[in-house]
Swiss-Prot record:
Family: Belongs to the glutathione peroxidase family.
EC number(s) recorded for this UniProt protein: 1.11.1.12
Active-site residues, record numbering mapped to chain: C44
Assigned keywords, A-Z: Cytoplasm, Oxidoreductase, Peroxidase
Species of origin: Spinacia oleracea (Spinach)
Identification of the protein by name: Probable phospholipid hydroperoxide glutathione peroxidase
Catalytic activity: a hydroperoxy polyunsaturated fatty acid + 2 glutathione = a hydroxy polyunsaturated fatty acid + glutathione disulfide + H2O
Lineage, top ranks: Eukaryota, Viridiplantae, Streptophyta, Embryophyta, Tracheophyta
Length: 171
């Protein structure tokens, strides 16, 4: 939800979302951080490579200001059927994910989470705004502006240069 329902949100930082443990998280805590926001799934063909590379990217740039926000979603092929606890166990044990895992959300349709409505309206896809599959990635700058959207098949490693640019890292 945006803080003020009468005005359209202008930044990711205006949203409050629920984490996988049921706690509300005000995304304004990420002001000054570069964010990679990803809809994740445990049983997708893209799961292993994406989780592995997201963890590597996070370990490399976390101290420099990168945060990865993972939102489980079961809208694509029912590939995230588990409970929040099961998703946490899977991501944190199998892939050593130390970045935040949020409550399972819808990313498309009338029940889409407000944060995803904002992300999609900020950076539409090649064939419309709707997400086409798991592991669609949104890159957000330190001010909460959505600067890029990447297809599910775009590997996290391949966007490292864009992350570095937003972090102000040369080379």
């Amino acid at each position: 939800m945006a803080s003020d329902s009468s005005a359209q949100p202008k930044s990711v930082h205006e949203f409050v979302v629920r984490d996988a443990r049921g706690n509300d998280v005000d995304l304004s805590i990420y002001k000054g951080k570069v964010l990679l926001i990803v809809n994740v799934a445990s049983q997708c063909g893209l799961t292993n490579s994406n989780y592995t590379e997201m963890t590597e990217l996070y370990e490399k740039y976390r101290e420099l200001g990168l945060e990865i926000l993972a939102f489980p979603c079961n809208q694509f092929g029912n590939q995230e059927p588990g409970s929040n606890e099961e998703v946490l166990e899977f991501a944190c044990t199998r892939f050593k994910a130390e970045y935040p895992i949020f409550d399972k959300v819808d990313v498309n349709g009338s029940n889409a989470a407000p944060i995803y409505k904002f992300l999609k309206s900020s950076k539409g896809g090649l064939f419309g705004d709707g997400l086409k599959w798991n592991f669609t990635k949104f890159l957000v700058d330190k001010d909460g502006n959505v600067v890029d959207r990447y297809a599910p098949t775009t590997s996290p490693k391949s966007i490292e240069k864009d992350v570095k640019k937003l972090l102000g890292i040369q080379k």
